């Protein structure tokens, strides 16, 4: 199976959900074995940042990566699109310190990546395969990884809220099945908004880029895109957080009520317990996974 990149550069512009600033991000094709690379230009200096579990420096309400020179927050939705579409190599050039929130989902990122086109490269695809069971538990939060020939999620959330309640999603993630969660938006509670604003967070948050719930209902006029949009979005976040590994993961992941912090701690545990093996997919025949995806995704968008 061959590695992939995008066929042409694309630019996104939008508001940072926490900073409230207008931001630009440009994605560029990258050569084989580049992986996912962030670039931030400050003045005359170009800083490079490669995602990794140790590059995560904050997980409050979003995943933030950084080093001594730069920080980039809210990276998870864009990374979910890249990993969900199985794009191996890409350069992400960021103007600012945050990825724009767009509509609160991965819908726009996914759509534009598909419109740009996916290009196969000569090099063989490499993955990190789970080779033994690993379990991370912190309070009620739980993530368990098992060996599996693919990338499969079994995600459960449980809220004491009449609209959310108990939701479960089982998904064998491929570029096609990823479309079923790409449009699921981030969510929050009206009771928490005032405190977030006092703490300098959610400065760009609105009903245009998040589902907001009061004690009994969704207050967005258009309602939900799916009855289980909440667990779909949590699965989206998980995929984005797993992209902190330098290569795609392969395994079966059972997740209960996790969040960005726990996802990152889980990745550290996978590394600490030597539960991952580097696998080159030499024997896999490359098929055009993207041939029918764009028309299919357009059909999905038409239903929203």
Curated annotation (Swiss-Prot):
Gene Ontology terms for molecular function: metal ion binding; UDP-3-O-acyl-N-acetylglucosamine deacetylase activity
Cofactor (UniProt): Zn(2+)
Swiss-Prot/TrEMBL keywords: Hydrolase, Lipid A biosynthesis, Lipid biosynthesis, Lipid metabolism, Metal-binding, Zinc
Catalytic reaction annotation: a UDP-3-O-[(3R)-3-hydroxyacyl]-N-acetyl-alpha-D-glucosamine + H2O = a UDP-3-O-[(3R)-3-hydroxyacyl]-alpha-D-glucosamine + acetate
The UniProt record lists the keyword Lipid biosynthesis: yes
Active site positions: 260 (proton donor)
Pathway: Glycolipid biosynthesis; lipid IV(A) biosynthesis; lipid IV(A) from (3R)-3-hydroxytetradecanoyl-[acyl-carrier-protein] and UDP-N-acetyl-alpha-D-glucosamine: step 2/6
SUPFAM superfamilies, A to Z: Ribosomal protein S5 domain 2-like
Main enzyme class: hydrolase
Known EC number: 3.5.1.108
Biological process (GO), any one: lipid A biosynthetic process
An annotated GO cellular component: membrane
Domain of life from the UniProt record: Bacteria
Pfam families: LpxC
Binding-site residues for Zn(2+), renumbered to this chain: 77, 233, 237
Hydrolase in keyword set: yes
NCBIfam families the record matches: lpxC
Record-stated family: Belongs to the LpxC family.
Purpose: Catalyzes the hydrolysis of UDP-3-O-myristoyl-N-acetylglucosamine to form UDP-3-O-myristoylglucosamine and acetate, the committed step in lipid A biosynthesis.
Protein's name in the database: UDP-3-O-acyl-N-acetylglucosamine deacetylase
Protein's organism: Lawsonia intracellularis (strain PHE/MN1-00)
This protein's encoding gene: lpxC
């Amino acid at each position: 199976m061959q590695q992939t990149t995008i066929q042409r550069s694309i630019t996104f512009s939008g508001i940072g959900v926490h900073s409230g600033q207008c931001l630009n991000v440009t994605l560029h094709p990258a050569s084989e074995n580049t992986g996912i690379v962030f670039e931030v230009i400050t003045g005359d200096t170009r800083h490079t940042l490669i995602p990794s579990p140790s590059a995560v420096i904050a997980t409050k309400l979003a995943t933030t990566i950084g080093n001594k020179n730069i920080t980039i927050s809210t990276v998870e939705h864009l990374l979910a699109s890249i990993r969900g579409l199985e794009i191996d190599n890409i350069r992400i050039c960021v103007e600012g310190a945050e990825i724009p929130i767009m509509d609160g989902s991965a819908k726009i990122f996914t759509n534009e990546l598909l419109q740009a086109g996916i290009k196969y490269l000569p090099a063989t695809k490499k993955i990190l395969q789970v080779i033994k069971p690993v379990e991370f538990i912190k309070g009620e939060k739980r993530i368990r990884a098992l060996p599996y020939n693919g990338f499969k999620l079994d995600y459960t959330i449980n809220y004491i809220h009449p609209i959310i309640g108990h939701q479960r999603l089982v998904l064998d993630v491929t570029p096609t099945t990823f479309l079923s969660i790409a449009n699921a938006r981030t969510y929050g509670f009206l009771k928490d908004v005032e405190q977030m604003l006092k703490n300098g967070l959610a400065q760009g948050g609105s009903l245009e880029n998040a589902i907001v719930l009061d004690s009994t209902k969704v207050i967005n006029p258009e309602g939900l895109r799916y009855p289980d949009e909440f667990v779909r979005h949590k699965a989206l976040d998980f995929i984005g957080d797993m992209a902190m590994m330098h290569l795609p993961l392969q395994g079966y992941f059972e997740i209960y009520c996790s969040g960005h912090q726990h996802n990152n701690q889980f990745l550290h545990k996978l590394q600490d317990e030597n539960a991952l093996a580097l696998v080159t997919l030499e024997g896999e025949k490359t098929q055009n996974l993207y041939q029918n995806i764009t028309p299919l995704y357009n059909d999905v968008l038409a239903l929203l």
